[in-house]
Amino acid sequence: MPVNENVILLDIEGTITSISFVKDTLFPYVTKVLEDYIEKYWDDESFQQDLELLRAQAVIDSNVEGFVPISTGDNAKTSVINNVLWQMTNDKKTTALKQLQGHIWKDGYESGLLRGHLYEDVLPVLNKLTDFGKKIYTYSSGSTKAQEYLFQYSMYGDVSGIFLKYFDTKMGPKGSETSYINIANEINVNCSDILFLTDVVVEAEAAVKAGCNSIFLVRPGNAPLDPEKSSKFRIIKTLDELLETE
């Protein structure tokens, strides 16, 4: 069988969904509806939990250059909006931001305004790997809920049943080898039994340092490869190549 490992761990953005879907559809959607969303859900328990995380993150970020504080009182809503936009502009991957984004996307998916993009090779290959007895997981900087919504409301319908579990940065940063050890412990396997697919070299390197195997994906619109760094990994253009005998 071409894939020896029993566990397939998938990055999402740039691996099984396009970077352009995230950058040109999901992120702009948050920016577009953020003010209305906060106004609509401000008093909801779910948003208040998001707000608590945002305030805690603001304390951590208070010494960061350009930091936008979250205030109380009459300007509270505006300050939250400005803080979220600041985090997004600076491509911060905080749990607080990702959780709020996930809830906003959920609203968009449920209303039919969003549909999760998947490359056309993804579902056929993952279904075959599942038939082979492989266990499929994801690991993304997006929250586990955001991942679930993408698959539940995908352009192909609800395909969330393929994935046994979703992991996010609560396991640790994707560029840290400890994160992959944490995931292995969480699903009770050895790192050597995990094949991690990603389009980011530092993530692939971290996974390998942890003892996992890693394959590098080259998709349209992904960042240019660094030949020196990427040469250490098997490089594929579609998941179909996982089913080929080398």
Curated annotation (Swiss-Prot):
It comes from the Eukaryota. NCBIfam families: enolase-ppase. This is Enolase-phosphatase E1. Its EC number is 3.1.3.77. Binds 1 Mg(2+) ion per subunit. It comes from Acyrthosiphon pisum (Pea aphid). Substrate binds at S140, S141, K174. Belongs to the HAD-like hydrolase superfamily. MasA/MtnC family. It catalyses: 5-methylsulfanyl-2,3-dioxopentyl phosphate + H2O = 1,2-dihydroxy-5-(methylsulfanyl)pent-1-en-3-one + phosphate. Pathway: Amino-acid biosynthesis; L-methionine biosynthesis via salvage pathway; L-methionine from S-methyl-5-thio-alpha-D-ribose 1-phosphate: step 3/6; Amino-acid biosynthesis; L-methionine biosynthesis via salvage pathway; L-methionine from S-methyl-5-thio-alpha-D-ribose 1-phosphate: step 4/6. GO terms for biological process: L-methionine salvage from methylthioadenosine. HAMAP family: Salvage_MtnC_euk.
